[in-house]
UniProtKB/Swiss-Prot annotation:
Residues 24-59, 60-95, 96-131, 144-179 form the EF-hand domain. Myristoylation facilitates association with membranes. GO terms for cellular component: axon; cytoplasm; cytosol; dendrite cytoplasm; dendrite membrane; dendritic spine head; glutamatergic synapse; membrane. A lipid is attached at residue 2 (N-myristoyl glycine). SUPFAM superfamilies: EF-hand (SSF47473). This is Neuron-specific calcium-binding protein hippocalcin. Coiled coil: none annotated. Ca(2+) 1 binds at residues 73, 75, 77, 79, 84. It comes from Homo sapiens (Human). It is found in: Cytoplasm, Cytosol; Membrane. It is linked to Dystonia 2, torsion, autosomal recessive: A form of torsion dystonia, a disease defined by the presence of sustained involuntary muscle contractions, often leading to abnormal postures. 'Torsion' refers to the twisting nature of body movements, often affecting the trunk. DYT2 is a slowly progressive form that first affects distal limbs and later involves the neck, orofacial, and craniocervical regions. Brain specific.
Amino acid sequence: MGKQNSKLRPEMLQDLRENTEFSELELQEWYKGFLKDCPTGILNVDEFKKIYANFFPYGDASKFAEHVFRTFDTNSDGTIDFREFIIALSVTSRGRLEQKLMWAFSMYDLDGNGYISREEMLEIVQAIYKMVSSVMKMPEDESTPEKRTEKIFRQMDTNNDGKLSLEEFIRGAKSDPSIVRLLQCDPSSASQF
């Protein structure tokens, strides 16, 4: 497809200004960097996993990266283009708490049925533990992915139906900051645990 232009087209820039929290200058800079790392203008899951591994050098980030990739890939075509990338980045880095929680919910809801089952939560938590357990000391009641999943469900599943709705997820996270920490996977926040 030839060499990509390193400047965003005006209509794309307008669209991204309306749909992200980034300035025009920031968008142009991100685009330049994106094309430098992805000359084709798209990222596949393997390329994404390699990039993600740089952020978590002491653990295995590949499974978690697959879940993040799936959530970034909003049109489910198996690739992430710049628009998908920058919109997800905007939500995760600059979005309001509720936007971040909605994004996280969509990542945890593996089958897309509008609920997070214990199995889905456990799969994500296992991926998080593989990625950060070597650099994070967990309290006893969160020492395994299973214990952490149970703790999250005890606090969030208010109607005890064995699954979390978006409302339960957001309400639980907003009412107790420790739940947000339970859901996070940032090793720099290890001291919070």
